[in-house]
Regions:
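Residue-level detector of anion-binding/catalytic polar loops
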Residues: 81, 119, 136, 241, ...
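N-proximal low-complexity "stem/linker" segments adjacent to membrane-targeting elements
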Residues: 2-91
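C-terminal catalytic/acceptor-binding lobe
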Residues: 3-6, 44-46, 194-309
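Short beta-strand-to-loop acidic/aromatic patch adjacent to the donor-nucleotide binding site
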Residues: 109-121
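Active-site phosphate/pyrophosphate-handling residues
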Residues: 99, 183, 230
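Conserved catalytic core of nucleotide-sugar-dependent glycosyltransferases
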Residues: 123-216
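Active-site nucleotide-sugar/metal-binding loop of Leloir-type enzymes
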Residues: 99-112
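Conserved donor sugar-nucleotide recognition element shared by glycan-biosynthetic enzymes
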Residues: 93-97, 228
Length: 309
């Protein structure tokens, strides 16, 4: 994905609302590093997101927990309805995603399935702008659990980009933070890779019609694809598009081995990356990202204007 040039920040002359505050008035000027996010609150009120979180061992990170607290408060303020489903102690992630999908499909009132993994940290506006985009499949961007940062996404030449440059079509992206419309699964039923499977893990029998392999591993072009890569490819096989919002840069929490060998390897990797990009080592943190750096803060502007088609 293209790396856009950073904008020159403006010097504020008036106070700016704190991060995450919902306002019906546009800010006159923003602090350096701030960004104003506009969403159509009337449209958002017609949606009902069903958040699904696989959490092996019944655990989630502090960053993820705090994200849900802020999300709940924001939805209460905006009047947005949402539901949530978790799944614990399922070590097979593909079966966990398929089971959560079956529960979502059984919940007829929900319009969107939102996968949020238990190690992803996010802000309320991240999900709001993804909903506001009204795309069939759209994700946020999060790094793999490695340093230097490598993003869990695959782009391609000639990809479509939204008029304002915030959305970009990709070939594959991770399901760790992915929003999917309900009718996507109805269309995926026509894909030969979507097969029913037996409910043999003690789930309610009413879920049986929805127990299908929407998320499964596969070998394509001699490559072993994970369940999220396969989902994206199957959807694109049917003519669907996968999008990411380049503003939605997330936190991915993991463990790290603190020793001199790891540090030495990190320095070597950063040096090689700096050489490839023609940058000084001290500047490589910003140049390594394939997308614009995230806003430090965001003010959500709740608008009632109709979304342009």
């Amino acid at each position: 994905m293209a790396n856009p040039q950073p904008e020159t920040p403006t010097t504020p002359t008036t106070p700016t609302p704190p991060a995450g505050q919902i306002t019906d008035q546009p800010a006159q000027q923003l602090q350096p590093g701030q960004q104003q996010i506009q969403v159509n609150v009337d449209y958002l009120k017609t949606t009902r997101v069903h958040i699904c979180m696989p959490c092996y061992g019944g655990m989630l990170t502090e960053s993820t927990f705090m994200s849900y607290i802020k999300w709940s408060n924001t939805c209460r303020q905006l009047g947005i309805d949402w539901t949530m489903e978790t799944m614990t102690n399922e070590s097979l992630i593909s079966r966990a995603r398929n089971t959560l999908t079956a529960k979502f499909l059984h919940n007829k009132e929900s319009t969107h399935l939102m996968f949020v993994d238990a190690d992803i940290g996010w802000e309320p506006w991240h999900l709001l702008v993804m909903l506001n985009a009204q795309k069939d499949v759209i994700g946020g961007l999060y790094p793999m659990k490695s340093l230097p940062v490598k993003w869990c996404v695959n782009g391609f030449d000639g990809a479509e980009v939204s008029e304002d440059g915030t959305l970009q079509e990709v070939s594959k992206t991770g399901t760790g933070f992915m929003l999917i419309k309900r009718d996507v699964f109805e269309k995926l039923n026509a894909h030969p890779a979507t097969k029913p499977f037996m409910n043999d893990i003690g789930l309610p029998v009413e879920l049986n019609p929805h127990m299908k392999t929407y998320f499964d591993t596969a070998v394509r072009e001699n490559r072993y694809y994970s369940e999220d890569w396969t989902f994206c490819e199957n959807w694109r096989d049917l003519g669907g598009k996968v999008w990411v919002d380049k503003r939605v840069l997330l936190r991915h929490t993991g463990t790290y081995v603190f020793d001199f060998q790891t540090q030495d390897q990190l320095y070597k990797d950063l040096h090689n990356l700096a050489v490839q990009n023609g940058q000084a080592l001290g500047n490589i943190v910003t140049s390594a990202a394939p997308v614009a750096q995230p806003p430090v803060e965001a003010t959500v502007l709740a608008s009632s204007k109709k979304k342009k088609k």
